[in-house]
Amino acid sequence: MTNIRKTHPLLKIINSSFVDLPAPSSLSSWWNFGSLLGVCLGVQILTGLFLAMHYTSDTATAFNSVTHICRDVNYGWLLRYLHANGASMFFICLYLHVGRGLYYGSYTYSETWNIGILLLFAVMATAFMGYVLPWGQMSFWGATVITNLLSAIPYIGTDLVQWIWGGFSVDKATLTRFFAFHFLLPFIVAALVMVHLLFLHETGSNNPTGIPSDPDMIPFHPYYTIKDILGFLVMLTALSALVLFSPDLLGDPDNYIPANPLNTPPHIKPEWYFLFAYAILRSIPNKLGGVLALVASILILAIIPILHTSKQRSMMFRPLSQYLFWLLVATLFTLTWIGGQPVEHPYIIIGQTASILYFLIILVFMPTISIMENYLLKW
């Protein structure tokens, strides 16, 4: 008798995706982050759903409703901090996942890669709108500053900003629509994840060597299911430690002050996971130029498959490219640090240098070094 998981219309899909899926035998722990992102999304949707039951998206009561969740709702504090720090964990996994794709050349699967970029934008939009909801000082001023960037778009900019605000400033209408979109977007993200996996399973997974692994495949279950579960345990332990021991470590103390349109905080900055892009934005002393650089800093991922000039897919056997990759990582850490610093000497020049270096590494150095490595292979 044929096994039900191979014949049942629904179970058949799950079986071919998570049980009998052929996977390369050499996948390292860097391939764990896809499933970890799935867990993060699940945690965020669940905690967010329960938070939405108690939250009110009105400027008069939003801040108090978050306080009420933390003080009066059973385990409300746990839900709130799991959701806030879960977002940080989400972005850690997301950046490591993208980094893995860059290092091992996974971007040559162009459909999977492009949907991944769409997912990155969707998650960033969701996180930004979520940060506005507690209606603290940094929520309000962060929303004001970031939405105001759209006014740099020629001709339609000002009208566009007022249309997004639903008025002449960030106010009740803005908060209500941000809550609506923040609730909706994770489900769109979940749908995009399905498409991401659909395209991935068309080609099969890449592997650390970058060499086709068709002759050497193993079933996903039990090998990688067990490996993924270990990853879940490690990540959830780290998240629990963060939530239970220092829940405000990654937050901004200004967000414990209710939003006040008449009082600007001394340093307006987004959450840590946006600081690298914020540093690039600030490093250009022109509004439109800064906005274009900000968008380009992420959209640049879309042209990476075109910039791949190496004859090898992975960086595993390319020491010069590896050096450049880690220089890029160091540059991103520098930008993240600069994004949290005030706009003054020497931070301005460090930020500008790091921003130029970021684009140079991706657009110029990496393709050039790859061509050099191709010649070195002939020797």
UniProtKB/Swiss-Prot annotation:
Chief location: mitochondrion
Listed PROSITE patterns: CYTB_CTER (PS51003), CYTB_NTER (PS51002)
Key word Transferase present: no
Subcellular location: Mitochondrion inner membrane
Binding-site residues for a ubiquinone, renumbered to this chain: 201
CDD domains found in the cross-reference section: cytochrome_b_C (cd00290), Cytochrome_b_N (cd00284)
KW Repeat (keyword) present: no
Superkingdom of the source species: Eukaryota
Assembly and binders: The cytochrome bc1 complex contains 11 subunits: 3 respiratory subunits (MT-CYB, CYC1 and UQCRFS1), 2 core proteins (UQCRC1 and UQCRC2) and 6 low-molecular weight proteins (UQCRH/QCR6, UQCRB/QCR7, UQCRQ/QCR8, UQCR10/QCR9, UQCR11/QCR10 and a cleavage product of UQCRFS1). This cytochrome bc1 complex then forms a dimer.
Protein name: Cytochrome b
Organism: Vampyrodes caraccioli
Lineage, opening ranks: Eukaryota, Metazoa, Chordata, Craniata, Vertebrata
Gene for this chain: MT-CYB
